[in-house]
Structures are given as structure tokens and as C-alpha cells.
């Protein structure tokens, strides 16, 4: 593999492969350290989302709290708890693993671990960096979530998947 670009936390490598029929081919692969995402559900039955600007799509998105696994060797649960505190100012009594998913396996090796967080309580937090400073926390009632997906307000795939999987662990609404 040849590294053709090295960024802050991403690398792009050109790799050679041999197909089952023996044909050789190359692919550019984005190397990513992985990420975590958290579905924080309040006692009132809402999910805490963050509204933040995403330069890659030039749009403000509503997403579950998430972040890169940027501390080598740190357990994903620890990273998830840190992101929950940093982005929405909460600690979780319970953190339940929902899925470890391959985000875009056609060109990237990133895996994201998604957790359900319940038993939320406020904690002091310090947002840092341009993206986190401008976050807005929005509580969306779970019964409104699907309508926000349907109307294109929520478009982030890990948010849609995370909430869908979290619902399996929550009591029925009503």
C-alpha cells in the first residue's frame, strides 16, 4: 500500500488487489481510526440530537452525538461517554451497545460503534474546536422522529439507524 495523502486523522492509501479470476486492480482506500455514536434518550422519551454544520455536505444537520476514536487504545464505551458529555452535557447511567457498523465499506475502513444512553444526568462540559462550539442541542420526541426523517430534516444514516435500533430496547410509547 502506498500512502497518497495523510490528513489530521485520515489517510488515503492506494492498494493493489487480486480478483478471484486473477485480474489485478487498484483501489484508493480511506483509512479512518473509527468512531462512536450515542443515542441519548431522556426520561421524557425524547432523543437528544445536535445541530451542527457539516462542511462536507455544506449543510446544518441534526445528528446523534458522535466522534472519532482519537485516543489510541481507548475502549469505545469510554469514547462514547466522553462524546456524550462534550456534545450534550450529559452522563449516562446505562450505556448499551447497539451495533458496530461499517460506514462506507466501498472505499473506507471506518467502523462506528453505536450505543444507547439512558438514565441521563447533566455534567459540566467544555466544548472545544470550531465544530463543537457552535453545536445546538435539540430534544426531539421519539414520536416525531420518523416525520423528521420523512421530510428530509434528519438525513444522517447513523442517526436513523441508531434510533431505529435503540427503539428495540425502549418501552413502547404511550
Question: What kind of feature is each model-predicted range?
Answer:
Residues 2-5, 98:
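Local beta-strand/beta-hairpin segments that build beta-sheet-rich folds
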Residues 14-16, 40, 116-118, 139-141:
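Short, well-ordered beta-strand micro-motif
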Residues 11, 33-34, 54, 63-66, ...:
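Active-site segment of metal-dependent pyrophosphate-handling enzymes
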Residues 4-44:
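Acidic, metal-coordinating catalytic segment for phosphate/diphosphate chemistry
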Residues 37-82, 99, 124, 131-132:
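Conserved Nudix-box catalytic region and its N-terminal flanking loop in Nudix hydrolases
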Residues 23, 60, 97, 101, ...:
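Nudix hydrolase/Nudix homology domain
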